[in-house]
Amino acid sequence: MLIEKLKYMLAPVDPTGASTHQENDFGLLLEPKLRKVFYDTYKEVPEQFSKIYNVKTSKKAKETDYGVGAFRPWTQFGNKMSTVGDSTSMPQVKYQKIHPGLERTYVHEEFASGFMVERKFVDDEMYDVIEKLPKDLARAGRYKVELDAVTPFNEALKATPTANIYDSQPLFSHTHPLVETKNADGTTITVKGDNLIDGTLSADTLKAALLLGRKQVDEAGKLIVMSFDTLVVPPALEWLAMELTKTTGKPGTELNDINVLKGSLNVIVWDFLTKEDACFIMDSKNHQANFFWRVKPDFQSEKDFDSLVKKYNGYMRYSYGFSDWRGFIGIKPNA
């Protein structure tokens, strides 16, 4: 059974009329009367996902990151106001134990596409359209990468996300659970991880997001340092983002107040963000949004021996996701 399955998987694709580009499908491309053919004449959107993700190369079938807890604040040792009696035990150090966290697994998925062209169409076509087909195939592959990379952010910026990250919470949440649940003295750690501001982009919500950035905590609830330096917005918020971060005067007023947000953040306009009233800030150096190339786009071509049909295909393999929610703070309406 396995051998038969492998034979089926490895069997070459036989060209058919329906799957092959033929002269009869593009008859006008064989005639010299056309002034211009509109194909592959538009500029491609530059690569954007690499401005957001840490782009890495993988040599394994999957990549796994692992989180652990953290030590809690020390407890008092002894009593400075009294002497230990002869029959009383001396103070003892309270030893802590860090707890295991959660795995973050990146499983690389495969993507492929291609096209076929009959021999005489290659010979007779007069406008170099066929020569442009491989270029457009590569362009379509790059577009697929952009669509995939933005998907978890578009999902997280929804009013009610349905997809969660490794900790069973949306990427942007008020209640990210911490690994450690008890302090060294046995009391409950009540702090939760919070990286969400409810509301639309404004001077007030942006200030609130930056303030929240100073309140980020580790897995034991201890304050940590994150340097939020970038505001990522959809095209619909580009001009507002520029007003908030680039103008000298306070936006929206005729007073001579200074704009305290000026120069505080770089702005990235991510054309593939679809939620027009939501955005996020990020620490571009310390965030853990990762994109792994297992196989970068690889292209090949061959001629079918019997049909003389020319085949072109491309293949790529990658994964992406988050190893930590820290490093991102969302600003979005909650309804």
Predicted stretch roles:
Residues 70-76, 82-86, 93, 105, ...:
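Signature of extracytoplasmic/envelope-associated structural regions
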Residues 1-56:
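Extreme N-terminal leader/anchor segments
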Residues 13, 17, 24, 83, ...:
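Amphipathic, alpha-helical segments enriched in basic
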Residues 43-111:
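Assembly/oligomerization interface modules of large self-assembling protein complexes
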Residues 2-16, 28, 169-219, 225-335:
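Sequence/fold signature of self-assembling virion shell proteins
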Residues 154, 158, 219-224:
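Surface-exposed acidic, glycine-flexible loop patches that form ligand/cofactor-binding
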Residues 102-161, 231, 312-314:
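Long, contiguous amphipathic alpha-helices that act as assembly "spine/axial" helices in icosahedral shell
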Residues 35, 99-100, 216, 297:
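Short alpha-helical segments and helix-capping/turn motifs at coil-helix boundaries
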